[in-house]
Amino acid sequence: MADVINISRIPIFSKQEREFSDLQKGKEINEKILNKESDRFTLYPILYPDVWDFYKKAEASFWTAEEIDLSSDLKDFEKLNENEKHFIKHVLAFFAASDGIVLENLASKFLREVQITEAKKFYSFQIAVENIHSETYSLLIDNYIKDEKERLNLFHAIENIPAVKNKALWAAKWINDTNSFAERIVANACVEGILFSGSFCAIFWFKKQNKLHGLTFSNELISRDEGLHTDFNCLIYSLLDNKLPEQIIQNIVKEAVEVERSFICESLPCDLIGMNSRLMSQYIEFVADRLLECLGCSKIFHSKNPFNWMDLISLQGKTNFFEKRVADYQKSGVMAQRKDQVFCLNTEF
């Protein structure tokens, strides 16, 4: 197995980058969406309909960990070879750890900083959703791993597993007040849109093989949620008056691509489960280009999607994906227009 790529390959923050962040933060003092709305204590009238629409999509997609059927997963897991088991364990360990980082970013930063009432509703709901993701990954680890020592090692993956630590460090370095809001919202979009992409794709590979139904169904729901969260980051960024130079955004995205590529193609190579690492690298680039376009930037990789079976999942920024009943799963009536919600007595039974 390849050596773990050390996070030192990713530059932390140079003096020039620090100076740019300070300059950008100075510009953000007068950002409308970061300044408190005077005396707005009620939701209506909706002032940001696009932001509110994202909240309603999230609400329509709500699910709980108890609804994931894991009854046949353990039998499937025990039939996997050792490489496949190793891969699944470490991917789940990363997911379980990363949700804690995302939650910290939401609770201590974005929910407090963004002053749009509609956005606060979304962030509050996202915190609940991320809690469900975290619970689901913990349940999966608990279900698959019966050795208590190994299970605890996976639950503390950031400290114990270098491949996971490297990804977590890159994500965690953006949870601070030293960088501008614009940089942090872009980096957060990269965490949810790029740093999860290879692992989501790999689990969908198991779905193609009709294995691990509980894991793959939860992956479908969670990847859908994270796709919406990624697009929401892009929407919030689009509302900023003081946007970043395109080169800065591209640099952040390229860093995220390098981190994800080193994780899923080198440190924990997807070859372990029979996937092609070269094609996986191309897929990560494809996802990154879609994110760049969502952020209003030009593509830098110009890579095509090598996995046509991934076309319909949420990582590619298709927010209309949420208007479909993914896996027949959407709260009834939540996305319906109020004018269409009519009570009638003339239906034939």
From Swiss-Prot:
Keywords: Deoxyribonucleotide synthesis, Iron, Metal-binding, Oxidoreductase. The active site is at 137. Its EC number is 1.17.4.1. Fe cation 2 binds at residues 130, 192, 226, 229. GO terms for biological process: deoxyribonucleotide biosynthetic process. PROSITE patterns: RIBORED_SMALL. Belongs to the ribonucleoside diphosphate reductase small chain family. This is Ribonucleoside-diphosphate reductase small chain.
